[in-house]
UniProtKB/Swiss-Prot annotation:
Gene responsible for this protein: pyrB
InterPro entries, A to Z: Asp/Orn_carbamoyltranf_P-bd, Asp/Orn_carbamoylTrfase, Asp/Orn_carbamoylTrfase_sf, Asp_carbamoyltransf, Asp_carbamoyltransf_Asp/Orn-bd
Pfam families linked: OTCace, OTCace_N
Organism: Vibrio sp. (strain 2693)
Single GO cellular component term: cytosol
Molecular function GO labels: amino acid binding; aspartate carbamoyltransferase activity
Catalyzed reactions per annotation: carbamoyl phosphate + L-aspartate = N-carbamoyl-L-aspartate + phosphate + H(+)
Job description of the protein: Catalyzes the condensation of carbamoyl phosphate and aspartate to form carbamoyl aspartate and inorganic phosphate, the committed step in the de novo pyrimidine nucleotide biosynthesis pathway.
Residues given in the record as carbamoyl phosphate binding sites: R55, T56, R106, H134, Q137, L267, P268
UniProt protein name: Aspartate carbamoyltransferase catalytic subunit
Gene3D superfamilies xref list: Aspartate/ornithine carbamoyltransferase
Subunit structure: Heterododecamer (2C3:3R2) of six catalytic PyrB chains organized as two trimers (C3), and six regulatory PyrI chains organized as three dimers (R2).
Enzyme category, top tier: transferase
Protein family (similarity comment): Belongs to the aspartate/ornithine carbamoyltransferase superfamily. ATCase family.
HAMAP family named in the record: Asp_carb_tr
């Protein structure tokens, strides 16, 4: 069967079909179980981070090297021709893409990855463009859910914290809307509620969702608890303390959880997950971060049409 992801730009999670999502997730599972260190032998991948990153950049570069590829690029745009000499982003993309087989980029400007895809000679993978999209985070989230739940259909998923500005929860909701029977529980302050356009998309897909005031009231029903931080910089101190108070997870909050419940978080956390949760069987956020390597290995291998064993 032809590989539908070969040479495909990965700019938005909406660019990826359900079948393609399943292919990536199952390929990630294969690569986690059976390392294949020569999949990207003789391939050169650009890792161009115009904005600071820790987990995304390091996991991409780890994925490339574990598959036998070579990384070129930068983690700070301040010394590039773009910054020093006024070169346009389009020209930078055109030149860099002529050196490589695939192009991973993060940029603070919304829409930068889409622009890059119009000028690149090779597949562009969006490592985050402002508050817009972060599709590879969603891929590792889906892989972590699949790994712990055994499926991506008929799941009850709670999304907690900053649902207004958090690009990870937007993309995850959009991705899971492609699957059957999922139900969402939105838990957020009114000022940080899920945007209307996401709710409209869920309505279009006949996806069930409802809003709640606390984590404890939904814990007995859910399979996945996806935590995010309330961003302190968006509020004054008094308002922030009030906002975050009702959206902190502790071990005692999980006393009525189902056995299969897993707690996820895109990281970094601040204090929205108490450290006593780390030792519970429900905590999965550090394994989730590790899964970023396997999800990105799978994506790179597929867009470059590598022959995957197993």
């Amino acid at each position: 069967m032809a590989n539908p992801l070969f040479r495909k730009h990965i700019v938005s999670i909406n660019d990826i079909s359900r079948n393609e999502l399943e292919l990536i997730v199952k390929t990630a599972a294969k690569l986690k179980k059976q390392p294949q260190p020569e999949l990207l032998k003789n391939k050169v991948i650009a890792s161009c981070f115009f904005e600071a990153s820790t987990r995304t950049r390091l996991s991409f570069e780890t994925a490339i090297q574990r598959l036998g590829g070579t990384v070129i690029g930068f983690d700070n745009a301040s010394n590039t021709s773009l910054a020093k000499k006024g070169e346009t982003l389009a020209d930078s993309i055109s030149v860099i893409s002529s050196y490589v087989d695939a192009f991973v980029m993060r940029h603070p400007q919304e829409g930068a990855a889409r622009l890059a895809s119009e000028f690149s000679n090779v597949p562009v993978i969006n490592g985050g463009d402002g508050s817009n999209q972060h599709p590879t985070q969603t891929l590792l989230d889906l892989f972590s859910i699949y790994e712990t739940q055994g499926c991506l259909d008929n799941l009850n998923i709670a999304l907690v914290g900053d649902l207004k500005y958090g690009r990870t929860v937007h993309s995850l909701a959009q991705a899971l809307a492609k699957f059957s029977g999922c139900k969402f529980y939105f838990i957020a302050p009114d000022a940080l509620a899920m945007p209307e356009y996401i709710c409209d998309e869920l309505d279009e897909h006949n996806v069930s969702y409802a809003c709640y005031n606390s984590i404890e009231e939904v814990v007995p029903e859910i399979d996945v608890l996806y935590m995010t931080r309330v961003q302190k910089e968006r509020f004054d101190e008094t308002e922030y303390q009030h906002m975050k108070a009702g959206f902190i997870l502790s071990a005692s909050s999980l006393k009525h959880a189902k056995d299969n419940l897993k707690v996820l978080h895109p990281l970094p956390r601040v204090d929205e997950i108490a450290v006593d949760v780390d030792k519970t069987p429900y905590a999965y956020y550090f394994q989730q971060a590790e899964n970023g390597v396997y999800a990105r290995e799978a994506l790179l291998a597929l867009v470059l049409n590598a022959t995957i064993e197993g």
